[in-house]
Amino acid sequence: MVRVVMTYADRWLLPEGVEEILPGEAKAIDSLRRKLLDLYSAWGYDMVIPPLLEYTDSLLTGSGRDIDLLTLKVTDQLSGRTLGIRADITPQTARMDAHSFNRQGANRLCYAGHVVHARPKNPLATRTPIQAGIEFYGEADLAADIEVVSLLLESLQVAGLPRLHIDLGHVGIYRAIANDAGLTTAQEQEFFELLQRKAVTEIHAWVEANIPSADKAAAFILLPSLAGGIEVLDRARSQFAHLPQVIDALDHLQQLAAVVMARYPSAELYFDLGEVRGYHYLTGIVFAAFAPGYGNPIASGGRYDHIGEVFGRARPATGFAVDITALSKLGFIGQHDVSAIAVEVNQDPQQWAAIKALRARGERVIQLTPAGQLAELKCDRQLLLLDGKYQVVPLQ
């Protein structure tokens, strides 16, 4: 039998893409998490805490193949069934809205917590990001989409982003073009993958091989290039005037943009009508927020009206999730240096009362021990008995 010798380095090693968060960053992340949840509460969103793992039968239902691939799966030792560790909290809130609430009208939910990815979304991403987000159930009107996009911009402001930049699209545009061309499910999936990669050369070759009608082929060729400022909507409107579903989607984007730009004049709105992220479960607008120096979205969301259908309660729904961990890595929320008050504890009741009063005010009071190092404890003040009264003075 081969004996494996473990070194200290082996015991310290974490799985690839899994990280620990040390105090300075942890405090910054938790501070932003609290600010976001307070923001969502102020807008009427109720916090929920979904379980970290569920049966895959419910966790992955209606969420699309991309979430399935991201989900880490294990066998439940009690039931023998397959469990999934959540890779996305949205399907969980959809189940909760359908099963755990008795609200017939609008239901606003928010959350914050870890998700776990079986593989990183990109080479620099963590597999254990911390997300915060909202879900708005029961409202199909444009007003709900406006509220959600507005709240995303508010979230970016709270996070301290120097620029507010959002990409907007609508999956209904590609869906209408695909239906008009009579694509099979397999063809729709093939072109979806090419469009997602913006593989222009391959798109031209695929269209030539699969779309015999010149008019319909032109729509597929045009789609990847429909990206830019709000003028893109007018360009698309002239090209797809014969497709009512596309015009409806463009009207929806135009009206949403008008309100959002009036509310947040400094925000940059970029329209990508070939954006099909989440195509398999999203049904309307799709959006993502980007930050300088980071090539992947720091937040994303959209409308997904049919996700609750599999739980027996189809409800309109829209929402987003913010990647708090990514924001921390980018340095926008900054690390919090915490100062503290040192004290040599004795049995004086007056001293204990002073310590309790300081802690009640939010001060960090640390008892000195023989092994304690003031520099490591980050103490910059001390509690001393002066003139018969315990007072906080600068550390000598």
Swiss-Prot record:
Disulfide linkage: none
GO cellular component terms given for this protein: cytoplasm
Intracellular or extracellular location(s): Cytoplasm
Annotated signal peptide: none
GO biological-process terms attached to the record: histidyl-tRNA aminoacylation; L-histidine biosynthetic process
Alphabetical UniProt keywords: Amino-acid biosynthesis, Cytoplasm, Histidine biosynthesis
Superkingdom classification of source: Bacteria
Matches recorded under Gene3D superfamilies: Bira Bifunctional Protein, Domain 2
Pathway(s) of this molecule: Amino-acid biosynthesis; L-histidine biosynthesis; L-histidine from 5-phospho-alpha-D-ribose 1-diphosphate: step 1/9
GO molecular function (one): histidine-tRNA ligase activity
Ligase in keyword set: no
Record family assignment: Belongs to the class-II aminoacyl-tRNA synthetase family. HisZ subfamily.
Note: This function is generally fulfilled by the C-terminal part of HisG, which is missing in some bacteria such as this one.
HAMAP family for this protein: HisZ
Role: Required for the first step of histidine biosynthesis. May allow the feedback regulation of ATP phosphoribosyltransferase activity by histidine.
Subunit-structure text: Heteromultimer composed of HisG and HisZ subunits.
Protein name listed in UniProt: ATP phosphoribosyltransferase regulatory subunit
Organism: Cellvibrio japonicus (strain Ueda107) (Pseudomonas fluorescens subsp. cellulosa)
